[in-house]
């Protein structure tokens, strides 16, 4: 018979043990067991452990059941009384099995919440484990030690504390290294190695895999912490740098303010001293005046006749009075002079400029500089004023700075400034920087707030004082005087010379040339050859400029005339080509009977001159022989008959003998090419051209179109 031992385990309650026999009864000690192999299965939470064995010793089974029940009761009572802290397994370890002997005890099952199936191959091992559990149940210390022992994959509190302290110490050090308590082979100390050796191969691989995953997670966290620490360190360094820079700026501003305050204090102390002296002198004068008033009042009150000594004092008294009056005059003069000096040294508006509007009062625009650049007062008026100068571009935007004019210089380049030309430049100062700029780079716009603050910072950093309101008022007055300046003849001559010096060409070449010729003649008369040579060079230069301007002026005109002449020649050539082509077409054209031709009648009698006709007849007779053309003498006779001056007898003879007229020999074999005869026939039939241009005859269709019939 085979017997089975089932051990059930609940999640929250105490462990309960049931041993079903082969016949289905629980707890009967008489069950027998047969078989040579045993199998143990452990399920999660509501699992059961089933042990099949074929040992013949039934008494050992009963003892084992009793020992297991007693052990479970003891563990429950001990846990209720003592309630010792149980170390929880690590979250990252997924191993739920172990090779320890506590798996066969109920105490260890009470502490654990999960388990895995396990097989026992030998019967002797089961007996040894049962004996061990029995011995452990008998001793409370052993059971408590076993219950408090950490499971596989768990980390004890001491280990966690040590690891946390080590991590803190490592984090405090700069060269931190990752360490999770295991070596490179994922094994710990000797106890850990022994415990892993006791596991099966599958459990060992699972445990190592869990450790690898845990190591990766911890390593990732370690790297993230390290990066965060480095970032925090960088932020701290940057903050420290910023704080140091701010402190330096504050120190500079404090130093500058202290300098300004010390200077103001010195000025105030001097002013107070002068005020004290002045107040003392005034008090003395007041006291003397009061004394005099008191004396006169006493004398009037007494109304007694005045003595000569009282009215006319002695010389000594007069001298004393004179001395006192001189002293009072001196004190008043000194006080007035002190006041004047104080006004000069410490004007009422001695405060430095604080707004861009105040500085804009002495700003010069490019338009003003263009008007004044040739004036005699230019250098004097401009020095001390301010301009808005362009220094270049930044991100495709122009950049301007506030600069003070310290002087006027002449540059090597002559440039165009509006409607005039000049070579003058402004020497500008911005803080410690000084540079020469041309007038064309000055802006017409006013100073902005940002530009004003930039200039103010540059002045403070250079340790220079800002201009006061009194200086600005004085400069503004000088600008107004320049606007209302009255010119004299000498100023006008200087302005004209200055403008002519930079002018490319004179406004009137003829006038300039005549003036130079006069000067040359005067120099030659006086015998000054050097001056005459200089004037001749000027004349040559003037002629060259005039020729260059003439070439430039007539350049376009000559080009246009050349184009017109070329077009005319081309039109003539094209018209000749068209005439030749039309004549060829006329020759090759066949006769059209429907074409209307010009048929202007001609009077035969008046058609030709008789002398010309006789010459033609003589040529024809010489070529073809006499009597070839009978029509010619006939026409001749007709013409002579009509004419009154001709002989009537010859005409009557020709008209009477008609047979003789037709009695002549005709040569048929003529040595004339056919092409020539054809050409003669065509030319004779063609209408005469008018004005040398061919004229095409109208056909019926063109005629109807012109008349509006079609």
From Swiss-Prot:
Task: Specify the superkingdom.
Answer: Eukaryota
Q: How does it assemble?
A: Component of the PAF1 complex, which consists of CDC73, PAF1, LEO1, CTR9, RTF1 and SKIC8; the association of RTF1 appears to be less stable than that of other subunits. At least in HeLa cells a N-terminal shorter form of RTF1 is also found in the complex. The PAF1 complex interacts with PHF5A.
Its recorded name reads RNA polymerase-associated protein RTF1 homolog
What does the record say mutating residue 429 to E does? Answer: Loss of binding to single-stranded DNA
Gene coding for it: RTF1
Per UniProt, the ranges with Acidic residues bias are 53-65, 312-323
From the broadest rank down, the organism's phylogenetic lineage runs: Eukaryota, Metazoa, Chordata, Craniata, Vertebrata
Residues modified as Phosphoserine are: 53, 626, 650, 655, 697
Ion transport as a keyword of this entry, yes or no, is no
């Amino acid at each position: 018979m085979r017997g089975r031992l089932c051990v059930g385990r609940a999640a929250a309650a105490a462990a309960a043990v049931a041993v079903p026999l082969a016949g289905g009864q629980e707890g009967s000690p008489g069950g027998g067991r047969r078989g040579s192999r045993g199998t143990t299965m452990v399920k999660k939470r509501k699992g059961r452990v089933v042990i099949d064995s074929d040992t013949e010793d039934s008494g050992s089974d009963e003892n084992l059941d009793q020992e297991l029940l007693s052990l479970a009761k003891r563990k429950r009572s001990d846990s209720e009384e003592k309630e010792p802290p149980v170390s929880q397994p690590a979250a990252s370890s997924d191993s739920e099995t172990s090779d320890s002997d506590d798996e066969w005890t109920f105490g260890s099952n009470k502490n654990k919440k999960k388990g895995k199936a396990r097989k026992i191959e030998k019967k002797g091992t089961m007996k040894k484990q049962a004996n061990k559990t029995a011995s452990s149940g008998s001793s409370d210390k052993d059971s408590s030690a076993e219950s408090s022992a950490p499971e596989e994959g768990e980390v004890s509190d001491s280990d966690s504390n040590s690891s946390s302290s080590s991590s803190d110490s490592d984090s405090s050090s700069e060269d931190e290294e990752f360490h999770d308590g295991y070596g490179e082979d994922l094994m710990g100390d000797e106890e850990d190695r022994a415990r892993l050796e006791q596991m099966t191969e599958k459990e060992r691989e699972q445990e190592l895999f869990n450790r690898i995953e845990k190591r990766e997670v911890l390593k990732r966290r370690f790297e993230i912490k390290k990066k965060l620490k480095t970032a925090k360190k960088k932020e701290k360094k940057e903050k420290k740098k910023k704080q140091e820079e701010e402190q330096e700026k504050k120190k500079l501003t404090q130093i500058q303010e202290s300098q300004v305050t010390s200077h103001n204090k010195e000025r105030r102390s001097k002013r107070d001293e002068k005020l004290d002296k002045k107040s003392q002198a005034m008090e003395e004068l007041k006291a003397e005046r009061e004394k005099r008033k008191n004396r006169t009042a006493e004398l009037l009150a007494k109304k007694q006749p005045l003595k000569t000594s009282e009215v006319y004092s002695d010389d000594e008294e007069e001298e004393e009075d004179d001395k006192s009056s001189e002293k009072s005059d001196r004190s008043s003069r000194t006080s007035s002079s002190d006041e004047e000096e104080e006004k000069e040294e410490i004007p009422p508006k001695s405060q430095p400029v604080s707004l861009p509007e105040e500085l804009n009062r002495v700003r010069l625009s490019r338009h003003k500089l263009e008007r004044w650049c040739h004036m005699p007062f230019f250098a004097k008026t401009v020095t001390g004023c301010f301009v808005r100068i362009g220094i270049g571009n930044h991100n495709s935007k122009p950049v301007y700075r506030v600069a003070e004019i310290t002087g006027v210089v002449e540059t090597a380049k002559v440039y165009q400034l509006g409607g005039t030309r000049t070579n003058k430049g402004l020497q500008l100062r911005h803080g410690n920087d000084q540079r020469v700029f041309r007038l064309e780079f000055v802006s017409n716009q006013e100073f902005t707030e940002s530009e004003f603050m930039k200039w103010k910072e540059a002045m403070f950093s250079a340790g220079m004082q800002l201009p006061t309101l009194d200086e600005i008022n004085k400069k503004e007055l000088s600008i107004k005087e320049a606007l209302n300046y009255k010119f004299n003849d000498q100023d006008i001559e200087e302005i004209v010379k200055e403008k002519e010096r930079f002018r490319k060409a004179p406004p009137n070449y003829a006038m300039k040339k005549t003036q130079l010729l006069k000067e040359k003649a005067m120099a030659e008369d006086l015998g000054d050859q050097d001056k005459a040579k200089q004037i001749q060079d000027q004349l040559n230069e003037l002629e060259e400029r005039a020729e260059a301007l003439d070439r430039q002026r007539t350049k376009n005109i000559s080009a246009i005339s050349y184009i017109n002449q070329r077009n005319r020649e081309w039109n003539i050539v094209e018209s000749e080509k068209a005439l030749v082509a039309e004549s060829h077409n006329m020759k090759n054209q066949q006769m059209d009977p429907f074409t209307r031709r010009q048929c202007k009648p001609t009077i035969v009698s008046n058609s030709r001159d008789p002398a010309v006709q006789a010459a033609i007849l003589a040529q024809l007779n010489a070529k073809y022989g006499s009597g070839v053309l009978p029509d010619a003498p006939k026409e001749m006779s007709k013409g002579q008959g009509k004419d009154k001056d001709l002989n009537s007898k010859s005409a009557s003879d020709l008209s009477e003998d008609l047979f003789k007229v037709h009695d002549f020999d005709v040569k048929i074999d003529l040595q004339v090419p056919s092409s020539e005869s054809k050409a003669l026939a065509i030319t004779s039939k063609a209408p005469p051209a008018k004005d040398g241009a061919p004229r095409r005859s109208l056909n019926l269709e063109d005629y109807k179109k012109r008349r509006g019939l079609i």
